[in-house]
């Protein structure tokens, strides 16, 4: 009876092993790259056959294959509740996918100066090299003092020079935004306009315009009530 049970168990093991490795012509040999081994235990870094099944069965936050003699499956992620650790565990994939909501193109970049007090030293620029300071052969080329004079020279200033020096007369700046000389819409002749001011827009004959007060101050009444135009 024992031999029958043992033979049945061997047949089941061989059947299961045959279903896992595939056809009989792909029999696993020791030293092969498939690593479909049932009699030897590999470490976690070695990705053997059906390694993902074991990883999915592991509880989070607890090493099921640790050196402890007595295994405690309750030591999983739930032991972190109520502690001072990070409240939410975020996977690396979730963190990378959440970056699509961040617009990094409009992030303000801090400008860094090329020259500052630490990188610039007066001894480097003003050192004695034995070469002329300006002109041909100078280490640091510099423009002559009258370099910008060529931008100010014109034909008129060169050919039509004033005969003597004189001080130009400074005219006072007048108020160019005055409404004294502005022509307003007439209440008596411009009757075709629809945008008129007043209570009765079509028969406003008060004679008061927007610049009437300014005209009275500029042209005071001297001889008659007629205001000059």
From Swiss-Prot:
List UniProt keywords, sorted A-Z: Cell membrane, Cell projection, Cilium, Cytoplasm, Cytoskeleton, Flagellum, Glycoprotein, Membrane, Transmembrane, Transmembrane helix
Would you kindly state one Gene Ontology biological process term found in this protein's UniProt entry? Answer: flagellated sperm motility
The protein's topology relative to the membrane is: Single-pass membrane protein
Q: Which GO terms describe its cellular component?
A: axonemal A tubule inner sheath; axonemal microtubule; cytoplasm; plasma membrane; sperm flagellum
Q: What induces it?
A: Down-regulated following embryonic stem cells differentiation.
**What protein does this entry describe?**
Cilia- and flagella-associated protein 95
Q: How does it assemble?
A: Microtubule inner protein component of sperm flagellar doublet microtubules. Interacts with MYH9. Interacts with MYH10.
Cite the ranges annotated as topological domain Cytoplasmic: 141-229
Q: Which residue ranges run through the membrane?
A: 124-140
Q: In which tissues is it expressed?
A: Expressed in undifferentiated embryonic stem cells. Expressed in airway epithelial cells.
Coiled-coil regions listed = none
Spell out which residues lie on the membrane's Extracellular side: 1-123
Q: Short name of one Pfam family for this protein?
A: CFAP95
- So which residues have sugars stuck on them? 75
Q: Which purpose does this protein serve, as stated in its record? A: Microtubule inner protein (MIP) part of the dynein-decorated doublet microtubules (DMTs) in cilia axoneme, which is required for motile cilia beating.
Q: Which InterPro entries match?
A: CFAP95
Lipoprotein: present as a keyword of the record? no
Q: What PANTHER family does the database record attribute to this sequence?
A: CILIA- AND FLAGELLA-ASSOCIATED PROTEIN 95, PROTEIN C9ORF135
Enumerate the subcellular locations listed in this protein's record, separating them with semicolons.
Answer: Cytoplasm, Cytoskeleton, Cilium axoneme; Cytoplasm, Cytoskeleton, Flagellum axoneme; Cell membrane; Cytoplasm
Return the annotated region ranges for Mn.
153-163
Q: Does the keyword Glycoprotein apply?
A: yes
| Top-level division of the source organism's lineage | Eukaryota
